[in-house]
Amino acid sequence: KAISELDCVSSLFVCGSGSDESTSIGGCYYLNRKNKNNKYLKNLFLGYDINNEIDKIAWEPICRDYIVRHGVTYSVVASLIANGNIIAKIDGRAEFGARALGNRSILADPSKRDIVMKINEAIKNRDFWMPFALSILEDYADKYIYNPKKLKAPFMSLAFNTLPDSYYNIYAGTHPYDKTV
């Protein structure tokens, strides 16, 4: 965040995973640039495809504790979230890196102050202090975050300050210490 706020920075790219496992991606980018290929990752959906595994999953034990629905529309998911439900979304290829980018995600209403505790209780061994990262549609980002340089964060690897008027609408997706997303 501090680097993005420097006056001399007008654009910034941060790999979707800032750990040792992303060294291989850095090597690929280095060779890509050196060889002038100009091919870049469009997404980080690099893992296995759940749609190829769906018939191999033992659903019975899962269905004892959870309601499992296949082929649910976005409007149904939105309605479930609006009614206070927590959704585990699994679709397509698994994401590489530190963030769930939509294919393996927990979806919930970020304006509910108690939702973080409910999710942490549902996910055993999750530390209570770990923040959740928000997914915000690009067209609505200016309503929630301060980003005067219009920096892109497609892999959710940049932090932004929240706007004071919208903080409580996205409370559960902000860092508890500094209210960033």
Q: Where are the predicted features?
A:
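Flexible beta->alpha loop and helix N-cap segments adjacent to enzyme active/binding sites
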Residues: 2-181
